[in-house]
């Protein structure tokens, strides 16, 4: 996934990954929180946003979405994969009005306009063999 994250960040694509962080790549599988896998993605140019409790998970999810649309910087929103997901806590649910207040509709429309579509073809983020690259460089 990390190579794809470089491509997403390089194209300035508004993206949010919501990650329930657990220890997977260490010596033994553990259900308890370990952010080493998330920290392995620091060099991908994704912004990292950590939540500490269920209320923050919901609030920061909306904040991350609004921020990525505004800045066109991809985000990883992560939280403890066991403790936070199993914690019983009263939260104040976000309403649709809260979401509409945070998310600018014009930014959503602009994001959708940048989508790849056969009606408006555009070339972005290509991968080429050395011979094709040289032909392209020589033609400029």
Ranges and model annotations:
Residues 38-42, 89-92:
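Metal-ion/cofactor- or nucleotide/acyl-coenzyme-handling active-site neighborhoods
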Residues 75-139:
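Conformationally flexible catalytic loops at phosphate/diphosphate-handling active centers
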């Amino acid at each position: 996934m990390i190579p794809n994250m470089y491509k997403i960040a390089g194209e300035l694509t508004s993206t949010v990954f919501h990650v329930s962080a657990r220890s997977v790549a260490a010596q033994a599988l553990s259900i308890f929180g370990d952010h080493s896998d998330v920290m392995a993605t620091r060099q991908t140019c994704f912004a990292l946003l950590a939540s500490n409790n269920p209320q923050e998970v919901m609030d920061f999810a909306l904040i991350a979405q609004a921020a990525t649309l505004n800045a066109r910087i991809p985000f990883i929103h992560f939280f403890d994969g066991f403790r936070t997901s199993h914690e019983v806590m009263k939260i104040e649910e976000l309403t649709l009005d809260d979401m509409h207040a945070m998310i600018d509709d014009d930014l959503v429309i602009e994001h959708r306009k940048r989508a790849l579509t056969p009606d408006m073809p555009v070339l972005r983020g290509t991968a080429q063999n050395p011979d094709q690259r040289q032909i392209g460089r020589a033609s400029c």
